[in-house]
Amino acid sequence: MWDRILGEDGYDSIVHIPMSSGLSGSCETAMLLSDDYDGKVQVVNNQRISVTQRQSVLEAKKLADSGKSACEIKEFLERTKMDSLIFIMVNDLKYLKKGGRVTPAGAALATILGIKPVLKIYGEKLDAFAKARSMKQSKRIMMESIKDYLSKQFKDEFENGRYHLQIAYSYDRAPAEEFKKEVEEAFPGIDIYVDNLSLSVSCHIGPGSLALAVTVDSIAV
């Protein structure tokens, strides 16, 4: 594909934005392959995945339209890689159990207690963040945690609405659309994008999961 883009399609350079190197080996593979293209292919390692990865593509397009080079776009995206955060509510622990990410005993106990774990993706790490006792509580945790992250680390952007929110779901869109209404009330006037959670994440957590993500608008062009 790179050969076609640089050849018959007539482009001078490529900005390639793979999923986070902490969650997949595809980024490292792309970096190795790019060595054969004499700097014409810039592979970005900005630790994004799913809906936040999409936002990186939109940022790259905006920067390219403003006249930035591929190298400048790569530098910006990697410099601002920590300007994004994802929280994921896991609906059913059996998929994490099958993948060896939680013990059978732990999964059984959590199911009995009705616990809905909330995971966090920040940078290259996916970590356990909180334990909710209901879907309602998990949603509240995600929304409050996004507000806390923004108010502490990006106060000016938060107060001036310079950020983007994304909701992602696995399998069923309807709960995501309902969640969107709640998020709109909590973050009035902010653009909210809804889409499928990427398969690379969904396959580990199963159907019925919801994610809430934020990406700070750091572009000044």
What are these regions (language model features)?
Residues 1-8:
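Glycine-rich oxoanion-binding loops at beta->alpha junctions
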Residues 3, 13, 22, 26-42, ...:
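Mixed-charge interfacial surface used for oligomerization/domain docking
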